[in-house]
């Protein structure tokens, strides 16, 4: 068998696609790379699990579950937990634990439900996270632009937004369902790929239906948020710098993924020289997002940090008092009456 996977021009869905694993001259380095990635992905999964548990554990009039921002974040966090866990247990394992390649790869030379589900759910989660960043950015923009009506607005649109987040990513995965998913050599390990059954509906092209609106809307929402903040007095504006950095970082990371998908859909044949860079961005941008988002949210939100780690603080009970005022509004989505109370407490 060849160390390169050669796909015949005409092959049936059930035909085996065998290959021989490449020799790894740096086995320990590959294993170390896996352990490093498994460590930070595991940390992300644990932190996101703790955030989701805290969001749904707390009850009361001003619980996290009444907060549209936290509900949106919890939906994305569930996807992040799944993505991190499956990458640690399968995706990164088969790439970097190179001694396993000769033993494991033959199980996937023929069609496998495991690789099909892995590949399908991976792209479902990518599409979900692209859309969720649009929703979260819109949520934060409305906090600044419509602070008084923001909470009522999201009471009306939260359910349709959540349904859309879970339904729309199916538009990316339908071609995978009818396509042949296979494994191919990746360095001295192997990874999962597919041969599209519908040629025009490749994955990068289908992702564009989310990525292009994402690029446009994220820019619009960010500029609108900046404009809204400039209308605030200096004291409140300075209190929002950390949140703007947080929002901007999430947006930039998601837009990098969108740019990479646009490249693979339209520009790969014209700019082959930057293909390695685009592959690097596609593979790593969400790793940064997985780790950054829970850590930044926990560090930024003092009350959430206390509830997660059961820390004692000066603030009694469950609430968001003594926070920077717009940070309270953007993170807690409190009612206008609670906003006035918080303004008095600051």
From Swiss-Prot:
It is a multi-pass membrane protein. GO terms for cellular component: membrane. InterPro entries: 7TM_GPCR_serpentine_rcpt_Srg, Nematode_SR-like. One of its GO terms (molecular function) is transmembrane signaling receptor activity. One of its GO terms (biological process) is sensory perception of chemical stimulus. Its main location: membrane. Pfam families: Srg. Belongs to the nematode receptor-like protein srg family. This is Serpentine receptor class gamma-20.
